[in-house]
């Protein structure tokens, strides 16, 4: 095919072909790995062009220098991109005039070496200095000034106009003036083209000179600058006339973007078409003009008329990068390459207007979570709406909700879901099957209220959907208000407080701290669906009902950023959230009665505490001031005893055998082990060995101000429990935390999973003076730090909570800590930073618990808004604690 010119720009090389080409006249730009490859391609093609140059020579000659006097204005028409100019292979011409010198391989090599540097300008320049010297008079030599100016201008512009195309610079010539052309004034070539290529060598000038000055070809060699040499200078053909008339290539143009339109028709039409308007006449003359450009030595570069070629104008502006969708092609095809828009947006608008009717894609992907591209048209973009893809387990086919207001703003009402539409997005996250996870919208609250529902209660809203999919629970699905981006706000779930306890779990993670749901979304996450969620028995709290006043802020979920997806660790107990920033104060009308235990026993693995008052899992040290002195009626059967029956009686601390905090009903899956502050010496003899031994925190007032955590020694009464109850309770007890009911939970985290050793993560009690241990001061997590269990604690068992505030102690199920075996570590004395106060309103209500026996003063029936903690220990307890220490 007829290659008019070739060139390269950076990692693109291009070939301009004539009308004879199969594709019709146009340029082919090809991207290659790097500029070196592009240059090589350019040169290779150039050599081939040289070989063929003879046939073109006449044409290029036709433009001889005589034309110079009448510079033929050759628009850059070809240079749509100015890059073409390099490609403009004035090769034909050059070959003919300069063929010897230009052709010389050396020249070529030099040219290439300088190619990036070498500028067509040099061709311009070539005429410049040296040429003027030899040929000063000759029309061919452009005035030095012109060449220089051109050169400067050229340097400024990366691509020479297509005009250059005709000239094929002879690389060699440029490099060495003498080499450049026999004629060449070597000096001229050297001096030639002040253009960037100058440094190269005036290769061109000499070359052009070598040709008859009149011969445009010579100059065209300069033009050849299109070859790898620097486009800017080369941008214009050296030919004076071409320089004069050729619109100087604009440097800016190099920066222009190539239209990358997909459609081939586009491509063909596009470049030409887009530039056509400006170069219309040129197109007709395309080939001819190309050849015609000759340097008119007369013209000074300044005179060069810059006529904006279409390419230039379009190039100046950004070419639209519209992806042409087949649908839009037609519209794009016509408009896409219209160069008139200075900003791509304009083009876009234009195209969009045309195509919008059928193709609404505006090229922008809606990022709003709820809003998915509405278009059923080609879904080029993946909807980022979380509901469409994120929920791993259950992907509800994303429903394109038009929750966008007329202005295109997505409604952020959280209630519906993260997405504006309040459809079963919640379901998806909450797992429709497991309605429990999803939280019912708070009564009276429309799921899609305009205002975001900040209450975290929405079931595992924050937790990733998988977390939500715990287990199916028979519970009405509640829409989850999942704003994943939003930190959990506390939705107060109102629990029906049968006991009248005010405590509301503010925990965002679960709609309720229902016994079923693990204490928090996090716990649920970690716990996965371990526990078959059974409806709670004897739970005073009905999930549907919620107290208006949240009395409790649970850190558990809040500590965890709702935004972070949680990975379910089904087997592992979730680490307690590191932050114990909030004090969990629970105002319980009554201490939950041990009677709840039976229900607890029923669940093989209880993830959540049943205690009606305290369905919420408390992560903070739960200080039940009451001393459980109830007689140990807690028998093996007690697990099955009716709730009203006191499940556990606390034996005197001396015996320690039966003193265990009553299990609060169903296995409470409190994440943290509650530590009994009371003198109550929890003897979990009744508790199956699997049950964690209760740790009682004994405050040795004499010894230190810090709460001392010692695990109560369990008397060997344990056998008293019937094996059946053991089996049933064992698992439940594993999951349930000891002393969940009353004991202060010191963030001790007990692994609920039966297969793992339950772990108690203990946060050390801060000293009463209020000195707050810095988290860094945490006690070491070595097993020895707190000897919680008589059984060996493997190093792996002891895990340090991420927050350094917690000590994780793994209690092996079935191991019962003996009080003597447990010695409070110094650290533990300093331990608890956060205290969860359960003010039992009515300890007396517990049959088995004699509040009077406990040295602890219990708040009067009226809940005091402020909790006073009195660490009263019976003297026997105190002495006992001291002795233990």
UniProtKB/Swiss-Prot annotation:
Q: Which residues form the IRS-type PTB domain?
A: 1-56
Q: What stretch or stretches form a coiled coil here? A: none
Where does the motif YXXM motif 9 lie? 706-709
Can the keyword Repeat be found in this entry's annotation? yes
Q: Does the keyword Phosphoprotein apply?
A: yes
List where Polar residues composition bias occurs.
Answer: 263-276, 296-313, 504-515, 637-660, 743-758, 777-792
Identify residues that carry Phosphotyrosine.
257, 364, 381, 409, 582, 620, 672, 834, 866
User: Which segment of this protein is annotated as the motif YXXM motif 6?
Assistant: 451-454
Q: Name one GO cellular component term.
A: plasma membrane
Q: Where is this motif: YXXM motif 5?
A: 409-412
Q: Could you tell me where the Low complexity compositional bias lies?
A: 61-75, 99-109, 176-197, 205-217, 516-526
The region called Disordered is annotated at: 56-225, 263-282, 293-313, 501-581, 637-665, 732-803
Task: Read off the SMART domains from this record.
Answer: IRS, PTBI
Place the motif YXXM motif 3 on the sequence. Answer: 364-367
According to the UniProt record, list the residues that bear Phosphoserine. 104
Q: Where is this motif: YXXM motif 1?
A: 257-260
Motif extent (YXXM motif 4): 381-384
Positions of short motif YXXM motif 7: 620-623
**Oligomer and partners:** Interacts with the NPXY motif of tyrosine-phosphorylated igf1r and insr via the PTB domain. Binds to phosphatidylinositol 3-kinase p85 subunit at a low level in vitro prior to phosphorylation. Binding is greatly enhanced following tyrosine phosphorylation by insr and probably occurs via the phosphorylated YXXM motifs.
- Put simply, this protein is called Insulin receptor substrate 1-A
Give the organism the record lists.
Xenopus laevis (African clawed frog)
């Amino acid at each position: 095919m007829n290659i008019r010119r070739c060139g390269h720009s950076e990692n693109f090389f291009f070939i301009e072909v004539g009308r004879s080409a199969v594709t019709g006249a146009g340029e082919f730009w090809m991207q290659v790995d790097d500029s070196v490859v592009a240059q090589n391609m350019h040169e290779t093609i150039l050599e081939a062009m040289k070989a063929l140059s003879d046939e073109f020579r006449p044409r290029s000659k036709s433009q001889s220098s005589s034309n110079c006097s009448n510079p033929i204005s050759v628009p850059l028409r070809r240079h749509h991109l100015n890059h073409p100019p390099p490609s403009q292979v004035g090769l034909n011409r050059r070959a003919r005039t300069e063929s010897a010198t230009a052709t010389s391989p050396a020249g070529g090599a030099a040219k290439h070496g300088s190619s990036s540097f070498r500028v067509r300008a040099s061709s311009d320049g070539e005429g410049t200095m040296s040429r003027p010297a030899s040929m000063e008079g000759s029309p061919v030599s452009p005035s030095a000034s012109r060449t220089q100016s051109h050169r400067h201008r050229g340097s400024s512009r990366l691509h020479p106009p297509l005009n250059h195309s005709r000239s094929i610079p002879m690389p060699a010539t440029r490099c060495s003036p003498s080499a450049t052309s026999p004629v060449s004034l070597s000096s001229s070539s050297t001096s030639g083209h002040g253009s960037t290529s100058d440094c190269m060598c005036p290769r061109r000038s000499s070359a052009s000179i070598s040709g008859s000055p009149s011969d445009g070809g010579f100059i065209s060699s300069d033009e050849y600058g299109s070859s790898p040499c620097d486009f800017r200078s080369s941008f214009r053909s050296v030919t004076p006339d071409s320089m004069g008339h050729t619109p100087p290539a604009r440097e800016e143009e190099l920066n222009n973007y190539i239209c990358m339109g997909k459609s081939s028709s586009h491509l063909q039409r596009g470049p030409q078409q887009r530039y056509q308007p400006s170069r219309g006449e040129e197109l007709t003359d395309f080939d001819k003009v190309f050849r015609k450009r000759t340097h008119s030595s007369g013209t000074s570069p300044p005179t060069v008329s810059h006529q904006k070629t279409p390419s230039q104008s379009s190039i100046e502006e950004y070419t639209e990068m519209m992806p042409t969708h087949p649908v839009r092609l037609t519209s794009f095809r016509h408009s896409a390459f219209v160069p008139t828009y200075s900003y791509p947006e304009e083009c876009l608008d234009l195209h969009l207007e045309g195509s919008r009717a059928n193709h609404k894609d505006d090229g922008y992907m809606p990022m709003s979570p709820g809003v998915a591209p509405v278009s059923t048209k080609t879904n080029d973009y993946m909807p980022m709406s979380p509901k469409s893809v994120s929920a791993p387990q259950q992907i509800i086919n994303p429903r394109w909700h038009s929750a966008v207001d007329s202005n295109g703003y997505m409604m952020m009402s959280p209630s519906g879901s993260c997405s504006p539409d309040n459809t079963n997005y919640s379901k998806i996250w909450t797992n429709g099957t497991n309605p429990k996870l999803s939280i019912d919208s708070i009564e009276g609250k429309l799921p899609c209220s305009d205002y975001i529902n900040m209450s975290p209660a929405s079931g595992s809203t924050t937790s990733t959907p998988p977390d939500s999919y715990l287990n199916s629970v028979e519970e009405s699905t509640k829409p989850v208000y999942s704003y994943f981006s939003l930190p959990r706000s506390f939705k107060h779930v109102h629990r029906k407080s049968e006991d009248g306890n005010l405590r509301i779990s503010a925990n965002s993670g679960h709609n309720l701290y229902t016994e079923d749901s693990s204490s928090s979304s996090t716990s649920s996450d970690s716990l996965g669906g371990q526990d078959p969620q059974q409806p709670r028995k004897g739970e005073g709290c009905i999930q549907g009902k919620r107290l208006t006043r949240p009395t409790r802020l649970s850190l558990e979920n809040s500590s965890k950023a709702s935004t972070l997806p949680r990975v379910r660790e089904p087997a592992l107990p979730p680490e307690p959230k590191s932050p114990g920033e909030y004090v969990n104060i629970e105002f319980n009308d009554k201490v939950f009665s041990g009677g709840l235990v039976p229900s607890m026993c029923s669940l093989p693995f209880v993830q959540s505490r049943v205690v009606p008052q305290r369905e919420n899992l408390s992560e903070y040290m739960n200080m039940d001031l009451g001393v459980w002195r109830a007689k140990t009626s807690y028998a093996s059967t007690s697990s099955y005893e009716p709730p009203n029956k006191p499940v556990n009686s606390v034996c005197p601390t001396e015996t320690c055998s039966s003193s265990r905090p009553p299990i609060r009903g169903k296995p409470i899956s409190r994440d943290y082990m509650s530590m009994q502050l009371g003198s109550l010496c929890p003897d979990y003899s009744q508790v199956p060995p699997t049950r964690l031994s209760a740790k009682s925190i004994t405050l040795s007032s004499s010894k230190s101000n810090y709460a001392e955590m010692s695990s109560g020694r369990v008397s060997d009464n344990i056998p008293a429990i019937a094996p059946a109850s053991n089996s049933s309770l064992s698992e439940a007890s594993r999951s349930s935390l000891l002393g969940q009911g009353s004991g202060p939970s010191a963030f001790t985290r007990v692994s609920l999973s039966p297969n793992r050793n339950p772990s108690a993560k203990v946060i050390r009690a801060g000293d009463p003076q209020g000195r707050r241990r810095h988290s860094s001061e945490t006690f070491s997590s070595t097993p020895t730090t707190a000897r919680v269990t008589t059984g060996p604690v493997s190093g792996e068992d002891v895990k340090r909570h991420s927050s350094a505030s917690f000590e994780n102690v793994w209690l092996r199920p079935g191991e019962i800590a003996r009080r003597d075996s447990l010695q409070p570590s110094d650290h533990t004395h300093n331990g608890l930073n956060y205290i969860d106060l359960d003010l039992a309103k009515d300890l007396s209500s517990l049959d088995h618990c004699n509040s009077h026996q406990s040295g602890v003063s219990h708040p009067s029936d009226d809940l005091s808004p402020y909790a006073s903690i009195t660490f009263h220990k019976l003297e026997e307890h105190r002495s006992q604690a001291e002795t233990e220490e």
